[in-house]
């Protein structure tokens, strides 16, 4: 079958956007700012291009992305060394480094620690296992304190008595399947058996209850975790053609498009052999609308800041979609590589 001129142009747009994001991710998240240390990975960049804050979880995501798409031992070593410094003290690193008033800095998330652990594991072949394993051992010590009395992982370790919000990220829920999957994939000896057992128990508790997660971002995390550890149980994405994208809340028909949610959905659809090509294209178009001319990815379509984790998810999503279409994808969709 001959590809129509529109199809060729459309797929060229996806390819160019993928490459712009990749170029942006290889440099922009590691930019230096006067109040932040070298080697940290930004969670978000201001309109000026300076990092707004450094984010350990996003450092983990970035290491996993770099290992797959842009391995650079010097840059990856700098990030691992930053994590080493952040986790060398008697208390956990701040969740958002450089932000004083963020409630997230009152505690530590097991999800974040698992993503950092995954990033260190992915970086180890490029920068050496000794340094990565040293940071992982420190993180494991804090994860051990997050095993609940029932043997399952707790989501949040409180470090400060100041009140914190009741949100999905501070409650147990199906999204913890992704936490557990990351820990179970760590190299032998990195994660103590007590934590690994807690990860297994957590998956058992939530694997049949994904529909109880009522926020799409978190539900897609749960589905990503299942895709890695129990692909036969992977839930289907409920898509509303009238909306054209997934809103923040499951079942809602209101709200704006969030880049991370749309990219997460597209990645999972690329792993589903029964997914509609039309629906995949709809998601790819929505993701594309969040990409700037410079390769930055906006959290909201009209946002002027640049979000790093949205860029990481969007880059992988567009790459997988391009691969499916046979027009220059770098990596074949693989649930084991879900970032």
Region spans (language model):
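Non-catalytic carbohydrate-binding regions of carbohydrate-active enzymes
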Residues: 205-215, 232-305, 332-339
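Asp-box/WD-like beta-propeller blade repeats and closely related beta-sheet repeat scaffolds
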Residues: 98-118, 133, 137-169
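Well-ordered alpha-helical segments within folded domains of soluble proteins
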Residues: 2-4, 51-70, 76, 106-125, ...
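Low-complexity, Ser/Thr/Pro/Gly-enriched N-terminal "stalk/linker" regions
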Residues: 1-97, 134-152, 185, 281-282, ...
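Buried hydrophobic core positions in alpha-solenoid tandem helical repeats
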Residues: 25, 83, 120, 143-144, ...
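Acidic/His metal-coordination segments adjacent to aromatic residues that form catalytic metal sites
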Residues: 96-103, 160-166, 205-209, 245-252
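Solenoidal tandem-repeat scaffolds enriched in leucines and small polar residues
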Residues: 142-211
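Alpha-solenoid helical repeat scaffolds
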Residues: 72, 126, 189, 232, ...
């Amino acid at each position: 079958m001959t590809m129509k001129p529109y199809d060729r142009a459309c797929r060229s747009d996806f390819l160019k956007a993928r490459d712009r994001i990749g170029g942006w991710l290889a440099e922009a998240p590691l930019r230096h700012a006067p109040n932040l240390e070298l080697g940290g990975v930004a969670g978000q960049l201001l309109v000026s291009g300076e990092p707004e804050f450094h984010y350990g979880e996003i450092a983990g995501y970035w290491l996993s992305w770099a290992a797959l798409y842009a391995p650079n031992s010097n840059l990856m070593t700098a990030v691992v060394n930053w994590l080493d410094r952040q986790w060398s003290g008697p208390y956990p690193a701040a969740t958002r480094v450089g932000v004083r008033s963020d409630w997230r800095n009152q505690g530590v998330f097991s999800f974040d620690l698992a993503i950092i652990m995954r990033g260190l594991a992915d970086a180890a072949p490029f920068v050496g296992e000794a340094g990565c394993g040293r940071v992982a051992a420190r993180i494991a010590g804090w994860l051990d304190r997050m095993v609940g009395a029932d043997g399952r992982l707790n989501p949040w370790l409180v470090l400060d008595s100041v009140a914190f919000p009741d949100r999905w990220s501070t409650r147990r829920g199906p999204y913890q399947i992704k936490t557990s999957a990351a820990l179970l994939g760590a190299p032998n000896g990195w994660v103590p058996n007590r934590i690994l057992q807690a990860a297994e128990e957590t998956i058992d508790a939530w694997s049949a209850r994904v529909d109880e997660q009522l926020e799409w971002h978190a539900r897609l995390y749960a589905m990503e975790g299942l895709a890695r550890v129990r692909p036969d149980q992977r839930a289907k994405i409920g898509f509303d053609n009238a909306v054209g994208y997934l809103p923040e809340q499951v079942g809602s028909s209101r709200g704006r498009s969030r880049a991370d949610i749309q990219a997460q959905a597209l990645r999972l659809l690329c792993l589903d052999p029964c997914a509609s090509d039309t629906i995949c294209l709809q998601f790819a178009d929505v993701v594309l609308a969040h990409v700037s001319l410079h390769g930055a990815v906006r959290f909201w379509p009209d946002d002027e800041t640049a979000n790093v984790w949205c860029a990481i998810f969007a880059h992988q999503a567009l790459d997988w979609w391009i691969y499916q279409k046979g027009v220059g994808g770098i990596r074949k969709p693989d649930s084991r590589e879900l970032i």
